[in-house]
A protein has these predicted regions:
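Catalytic NTP-binding/metal-coordinating core of nucleotidyl cyclase/transferase enzymes
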Residues: 2-112, 119
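A short acidic (Asp/Glu
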Residues: 22-24, 89, 136-143, 171-174
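A short glycine-enriched loop-to-beta-strand structural element that forms part of the catalytic core
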Residues: 79-86, 122-134
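Catalytic/regulatory signature loops of cyclic-dinucleotide turnover enzymes
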Residues: 115-126, 130, 145-166
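Intrinsically disordered, glycine/charged-rich C-terminal tails and inter-domain linkers
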Residues: 157-160, 164-278
């Protein structure tokens, strides 16, 4: 790997919660079929994710279709068992305007991925980082990938968090945009939330928590349908997503993740109402 030069960019790392249970409780053919659908969806050549990202991006500002599709092609996806890695790199002399476009596309793609996977009964926990790293084919090295891995695995719920460094860089670029719709979208996409972290306690009141920037999966205008329909039992809705594909949801650790995810969604719903983005 001596000929590989470090690259600056963005990394998103996502783990599928309950993946082992999913494999254990389904036939090989069923598991392969479901995973194949996931792979097709997160591929940047897939019509679903491309069209959704393009629709959101075009709605936020007057983007050229050719430029948007070029940015989508430049973003890379890698899948290792229960882990999905999303990568976007910057050129050495990348212009701020180009960086801004890549950040916005990246965040929207992450939103689409997380929402699709939750709706498909394969909730994710993930983290978005930025910095210098090495990657070639399927080999990764560098602080951002380690940071994303450790942060994602520390989450005790289904959520996608963003490091302070990643948030500050994206916020500086995007909030300097001349497009008010872009700034409004960005400031609705990310909120600060007390994220519950893994510990050995079964008592949710005693869990370690950390205030982290968190992707808002309930931004209604980002997709035509919200994850949570109005007047639904929120806990039951989240529980059903965790139970899909014959997954067992009986262990205290899993039920705690369900409860923590429900609390996050309650916060996101309140945020939407307060900020009139419903």
């Amino acid at each position: 790997m001596s000929n590989i030069k470090p690259q600056e960019g963005i990394i998103g790392l996502y783990d599928i919660l309950g993946y082992k249970d999913f494999l254990d409780n389904n036939s090989f053919d069923t598991a392969v079929k479901d995973i194949d659908n996931v792979l097709k969806t997160i591929s940047n050549s897939d019509k679903y994710i491309t069209n959704k990202i393009f629709d959101i991006f075009m709605r936020s500002h007057n983007a050229n279709e050719i430029i948007v599709k070029k940015l989508l092609r430049q973003m890379r996806w890698f899948i290792f068992s229960d882990t999905i890695i999303q990568v976007s790199t910057f050129k050495k002399d990348e212009r701020p305007g180009s960086k801004y476009n890549k950040w916005l596309i990246f965040l929207i793609a992450s939103l689409v991925l997380n929402r699709y996977m939750f709706n498909s009964g394969l909730p994710l926990r993930g983290a978005i980082t930025t910095g210098n790293f090495l990657f070639r084919k399927l080999c990764f090295a560098g602080k951002p990938i380690i940071e994303a891995y450790e942060l994602a695995n520390s989450l005790d719920l289904s959520a996608c968090v963003i490091t302070d460094e990643a948030y500050n860089e994206s916020a500086t670029l995007i909030n300097s945009s001349k497009y008010e719709k872009v700034k409004k979208l960005f400031n609705a996409l990310i909120i600060k939330y007390q994220i519950p972290k893994n510990d050995k306690s079964s008592n949710t009141d005693n869990q370690n928590q950390k205030s982290l920037f968190t992707l808002n999966l309930l931004v209604p205008k980002a997709l035509k349908l919200s994850i949570i329909k109005k007047d639904v039992d929120l806990y039951k809705c989240v529980l059903n997503k965790f139970k899909m594909h014959n997954k067992r949801v009986t262990e205290k650790e899993v039920l705690r993740k369900v409860e923590n995810t429900k609390k996050l969604f309650e916060c996101l719903i309140d945020f939407a109402k307060t900020n009139k983005i419903t």
